[in-house]
């Protein structure tokens, strides 16, 4: 039922003054046989409604029927004839002058009509035309003369709830992202600390190794295998890798120098041997055992001519250099004094430095591969740090944007509230101002 059919159902939306008179009708007393006097009385309430907005007053008699006229009246308890009904129609209207000439004319809200104000959407804000001005729909104040329908309130409530839900979801996602960034930052800090510790240890080991490089190369060649074994057994994985890499490099250098020296000695020995063969083509059998310390590249006839006691001074010098070379090889490969007369052990002793060199080269290649992998991991770590820094900047920008949005909302709310209060105060001032020639005064411009 519309508000015109049952106007008192929407009494909370009407802004008027109501005066009620109760008329009581008494009937004549009836005398019964039992000498009892009975009199009947009927109360009729009369309401005179005086609206506040310059409308005509009208008289309203309450309904005397007990049948409900609307859904709200049907839900109320049934009353007797003596109790006044609270629903009626306007029975009579009479014209008269408005009680307050300064009041404005009747609006649609005063007539209890369904009124949907015009709306305009600018960017993501909705504005409503209310009381002669455009007001933001999310933060506007309800006017006492404006009573929108229930569907309008329902839609507005749902819009506000949807906006709040979106803001909550956005804040939740930002919190989750911030938490993930914090965890990633903690992990990166831990990795940075570990890398710093490794770098300090690497510096210490490099300084220790540089101090050890002052010792002679031959002494290092003889003790390199034992030092490598001890380091692999005692030091941790990282230290052992770095130490073995450095030791292998030093051993490779020493072995290269040793091979160059041996090649030079072998070239000199071959030249002297060719010159001796031209002088004496035959060799004595007593000088064969002295050939045990030479490498397989040298023949037995060459060694016999170098070790003759009655040879020329050049051959004696060559024999001295070969003996020194033999001692260096024996120190590098180990003592072999008992096996000097056999050819098989001499071959194994001469092949040991080459085998050691091959193993060292293999270890060096493996360590180079590990170093390359570590460098790739370091590059990936730097890339992750850069991404983390970019994420932190984006998170900071989002946080500042949300902060500015909240500040803008607060400013808009305060401005609308202040303007609404100023308008209410202006209207109250107009109400207290005296009338001049029964004309409405002009309103000053809004601040």
Curated annotation (Swiss-Prot):
Residues bearing the modification Phosphoserine: 41, 85, 88, 96, 123, 143, 147, 149, 211, 224, 272, 275, 333, 336
Segments of skewed composition (Basic and acidic residues): 218-232, 277-290
Low complexity bias: start-end ranges: 266-276
Keywords recorded for this protein, A-Z: Coiled coil, Phosphoprotein
Sections of the chain in a coiled coil: 164-197, 237-264, 354-412
First and last residue of the signal peptide: none
InterPro entries in UniProt: Chibby_fam
Chain segments carrying region Disordered: 208-244, 266-320
Any single GO CC term annotated in Swiss-Prot or TrEMBL for this entry: cytoplasmic vesicle
UniProt family annotation: Belongs to the chibby family. SPERT subfamily.
PANTHER family: LEUCINE-RICH PROTEIN, PROTEIN CHIBBY HOMOLOG 2
Assembly: Homodimer. Binds to NEK1.
Protein name in UniProt: Protein chibby homolog 2
Lineage: Eukaryota, Metazoa, Chordata, Craniata, Vertebrata
Recorded name of the encoding gene: Cby2
């Amino acid at each position: 039922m519309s508000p015109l059919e049952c106007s008192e159902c929407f009494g909370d939306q009407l802004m008027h003054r109501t005066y009620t008179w109760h008329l009581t009708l008494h009937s004549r007393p009836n005398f019964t046989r039992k000498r009892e006097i009975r009199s009947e009385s009927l109360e009729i309430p009369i309401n005179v409604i005086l609206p506040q907005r310059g409308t005509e007053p009208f008289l309203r008699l309450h309904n005397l029927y007990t049948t409900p006229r609307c859904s709200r009246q049907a839900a109320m308890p049934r009353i007797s004839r003596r109790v006044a009904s609270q629903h009626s129609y306007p029975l009579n209207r009479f014209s008269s002058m408005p009680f307050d000439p300064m009041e404005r004319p009747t609006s649609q809200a005063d007539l209890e009509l369904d009124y949907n104000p015009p709306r305009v959407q600018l960017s993501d804000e909705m504005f409503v035309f209310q009381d002669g001005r455009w007001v933001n729909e999310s933060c506007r104040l309800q006017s006492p003369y404006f009573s929108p329908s229930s569907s309008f309130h329902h839609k507005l409530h749902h819009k506000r709830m949807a906006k709040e839900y979106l803001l909550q979801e956005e804040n939740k996602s930002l919190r989750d992202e911030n938490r993930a960034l914090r965890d990633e930052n903690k992990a990166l800090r831990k990795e940075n600390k570990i890398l710093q510790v490794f770098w300090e240890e690497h510096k210490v080991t490099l300084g220790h190794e540089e101090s050890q490089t002052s010792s002679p190369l031959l002494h290092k060649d003889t003790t390199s295998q034992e030092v490598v074994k001890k380091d692999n057994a005692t030091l941790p994985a990282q230290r052992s890798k770095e130490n073995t890499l450095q030791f292998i490099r030093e051993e490779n250098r020493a072995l290269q120098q040793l091979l160059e020296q041996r090649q030079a000695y072998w070239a000199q020995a071959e030249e002297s041997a060719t010159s001796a063969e031209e002088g004496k083509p035959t060799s004595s059998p007593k000088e064969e055992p002295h050939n045990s310390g030479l490498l397989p590249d040298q023949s037995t006839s060459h060694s016999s001519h170098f070790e003759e006691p009655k040879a020329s001074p050049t051959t004696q010098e060559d024999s001295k250099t070969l003996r020194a070379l033999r001692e260096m090889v024996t120190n590098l490969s180990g003592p072999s004094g008992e096996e000097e007369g056999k050819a098989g052990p001499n071959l194994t002793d001469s092949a040991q430095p080459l085998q050691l060199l091959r193993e060292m080269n293999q270890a060096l290649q493996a360590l180079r591969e590990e170093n390359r992998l570590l460098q790739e991991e370091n590059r990936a770590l730097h890339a992750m740090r850069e991404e983390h820094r970019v994420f932190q900047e984006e998170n900071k920008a989002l946080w500042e944007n949300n902060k500015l949005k909240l500040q803008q909302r607060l400013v808009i709310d305060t401005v609308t509230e202040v303007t609404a209060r100023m308008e209410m105060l202006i209207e109250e001032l107009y109400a207290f101002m005296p009338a001049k020639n029964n004309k409405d005064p002009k309103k000053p411009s809004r601040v």
